[in-house]
UniProtKB/Swiss-Prot annotation:
Transmembrane segments: none annotated. The keyword Methyltransferase applies. InterPro entries: COMT-like (IPR016461), O_MeTrfase_dom (IPR001077), Plant_O-MeTrfase_dimerisation (IPR012967), SAM-dependent_MTases_sf (IPR029063), WH-like_DNA-bd_sf (IPR036388), WH_DNA-bd_sf (IPR036390). It comes from the Bacteria. Catalyzes the S-adenosyl methionine-dependent conversion of 8-amino-8-demethyl-D-riboflavin (AF) into 8-methylamino-8-demethyl-D-riboflavin (MAF) and roseoflavin (RoF), the last two steps in the biosynthesis of the antibiotic roseoflavin. Belongs to the class I-like SAM-binding methyltransferase superfamily. Cation-independent O-methyltransferase family. Pfam families: Dimerisation, Methyltransf_2. This is 8-amino-8-demethylriboflavin N,N-dimethyltransferase. GO terms for biological process: antibiotic biosynthetic process; methylation. Optimum temperature is 52 degrees Celsius. Homodimer. The gene is rosA. Optimum pH is 8.8.
Amino acid sequence: MRPEPTEHPERTAAQRLYQYNVDLKVAFVLYAVAKLHLPDLLADGPRTTADLAAATGSDPSRLRRLLRAAAGADALREVPEDSFELAPMGDLLRSGHPRSMRGMTTFFAEPDVLAAYGDLVESVRTGVPAFQLRHREPLYDFLARPQHKEVRDEFDAAMVEFGQYFADDFLTSFDFGRFTRFADIGGGRGQFLAGVLTAVPSSTGVLVDGPAVAASAHKFLASQNLTERVEVRIGDFFDVLPTGCDAYVLRGVLEDWADADAVRLLVRIRQAMGDAPEARLLILDSVIGETGELGKVLDLDMLVLVEGEHRTRAQWDDLLARAGFDIVGIHPAGDVWAVIECRGTAG
């Protein structure tokens, strides 16, 4: 995150500050492009500005300027006859793309979400998550309200997309083949668990999550031909944790949670694990100071949106010790994440 030393460090710093301000504008451009469903409209090839304006109910002149900005950001390409076509980045904003990143692009720029980032200063001063300051309720309560369904759908899509984006980093950084039965706690529709079971064909799994994902989980696992290998348990994490697994996985769960709640869940997992010497808790999360600099920046999302945080090694050691675990090893997985391998402590 720091510029390379040059003969003109102040100029380099100024260039980076300017670029950060431009990047913020690019995020808004991509948000507008996605919300107008322009990538979906361009999926079959170039279309004119007039055609796109009619399809989206937009002012042609202003739409042209948005399209031009999107081309400047490499999401679209400007072609002859006042027309535009998808570039590879824009293609990833299509709703039906198998590796779409539309949800994360729209969710974080939604006005209700973006407004919370505007309260960052007050959040730092008060110690209260900025989202809660802005909306007078926690993020997940807000998302559960029927009037916020569109934002909730974008959030859910963003979580799936993050999982897709980072899955290979996790799967190639750690030997999951050591285990035979996985419990994926808070595993959503089962996307990561499916990747693990595909990589380890002899293994089985238990997917644990809340009622909101039940239908999508069963549908997704069926699409991956994994129905016979995965047991789906729907309910409160504290009530439905399975016993008898040799790997308990928490992927991106504890970063959302304050320490007290995290310890409660970890204690419950420790009870479910029992005393099998080879059983492991695998926490897929950031370790500040041992993973890349980007993890420090992404911790801003935790600061603004929820009660959790990206923790340091010392914080992880303390948190896990309070629940009866110690860390066997930390396996970096790309620039942000790591697999934190934990075992139960004796006694």
